[in-house]
Amino acid sequence: MTASNHLLFELGCEELPPKSLKKLSQALLDNILAGLKEADLTYNQARAYATPRRLAVLIDDLQSFQADKIVEKRGPAVQAAFGPDGAPSKAAQGFAASCGATFEQLERLETDKGTWLIFKQAVKGQATADLIPDIIRKSLSNLPIAKRMRWGNFDAEFARPVHWAVLLFGEQVIATDILGVNTGRNSRGHRFHAPQDLNIASPHDYVDTLLQQGKVIADFEQRMIRIRDAANQAAANVGGMAHIEDDLLEEVAALNEWPVPVVGNFDARFLELPMEVLITTMQSNQKYFPVKNDQGGLLPHFITFANIESSNPASIQHGNERVVLPRLADAEFFWKQDRKQSLADRVESLASIVFQKDLGTLLEKTERVAKLAALIAGQLQADVELAKRAALLAKTDLMTNMVGEFANLQGIMGRYYALADGEHAEVALAQEEHYFPKQSGGATPSGKIGQILSLAEKIDTLAGIFSAGLIPTGDKDPYALRRATLGILRVLIENGIALDVVELLDAALDQFSHSFNKGETRQRVVDFIFDRLKGYCLDQGYSSDEFEAVLAVNPTRPLDFMLRIRAVQTFRQLPEAESLAAANKRIINILKKSEHAIPETIGTLVEAAEKNLLAAAEASDTEILPLLAEQNYQLALNRLAQLRDTVDAFFDNVMVNTDDVALRNSRLALLAMLSNQFLKIADISKLQS
């Protein structure tokens, strides 16, 4: 049985950036595990720990020694290893010397590409304790730290100054230098509750020692659970429920080693402000959890977390109440000031903001979007004037004080201000919903005008940025065009909107006045859209070949595309599917090889099998036409599946490329007719068996 032991590494430092703590913790674990894999060291399980002042990794049952192994070095080919006289060539002798061996110690390796000289050397495995320091140093140097810093007189660099390091393998310290500090077994507890050194007897004592002696909850996830539970209990104590968002929960966990809840209060007059304003003020500025009532409205309370068990918690409460008061007062001031000017009165001020140098100002974008919105509304038989009005106002809340202070409230404040201005309810709702979906899986607009405006705004942005030559590459997508494109597709598909996305693109491109190659831009955008559609389909559980089968017939209405791919997925489950897919592939290959144009009409046929196929194909053609008109592609494919036996009989009994030209043309025309019936839905020859 291979000897093993537990490994603990902890790096203690000044408070780490809270928004990157979890990412740093996971990256350190991943890097160390990658180093162990590279060193051929096995282990049982591994866990990462992270608090504001430490990153740690605990690995169970880590192999104590590398296994001995045979290292094989390959040298020159045998044909180059000997001279004309049969003596070893310089290449062979040089290879032997580089291995520290004689020519006689070399062996031969036969492969399908030839025979080679090789040298096999037994390498004794190293002790894990000797390998760990370099693995850790490399892991730390590869952490995703945007800006590293130096401290004292050290050359070491890290996200924050390092104060201690624990490195234990079993109960033994691996003595080394990590980022300018000597490793040992002494950790440190809470900065105020337990600032003294904490002796870690063994790796598995780490978590309990910090908890019991150090007032530190080392496990990030456990701190999140504790914070969530404590916030919920504290909210219940004042008759409410904690409003907890995951991002803030993570950030608060990254700010506290020993989180203690504190309930604070604010003046109920502030509840007259939009709820989102209060929530943003408390969350963004103060890292507070708001408290809601059972109807979903806010209560005049908040929950904050102190990183200390205070002997005077009332002072912490009052201090936080004093701090949040001016923040809420500022929000109240912005709300009152902004309402002195309507959104409509702010439209002209959009001319002061450049959207993109080739695409003009936000006012010019607004005018383009309004035209697109009117076009879309007309096609959907929606209220054109409401769509134009919603588009006209869509970006005006960017000119308000509130959105200037809280950018994440764009659209939300537009809705509130539009309602306050007396705008139509659908226009007001569209101010917020045209930004939907905001993230992957997020809700699409619920209102028709919001759907129209969302499409118009995103299409204009997509077409415009591509026309300016700013095409996303790799992970660079400054205008979030991937998200915008997926948003277009989701709005169309998930709301049952049967618009042609290429027609919308053409309408958008026609509005730009700057010089660009329209045809080239159009094709690039179309490719980009369908690349996003492929990703969407794969996420929905469709396969790549099902997507390619539908893409081959070039449907440009995403909703129609989804109806087709759903039908193809169902079709391929039929017992006839594999045979028909193979037959279609054969038909397409036959038609491609034809040296002459294939006649549109089918002439005389002589064999019973081909006459039967013609009759069956004519019958199916008649029956699927109304199904295609209804976009009932599933029933249409089910009907075409009934052709299997007739198609198989044709290929079993008929030679297509007969010497009789007229007969050959008739048979080719018959196959073209059959192929075209399937191609009205999808190219099922793309389906893999």
Describe the role of every protein-language-model region:
Residues 1-689:
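Amphipathic alpha-helical "coupling" segments that flank catalytic cores
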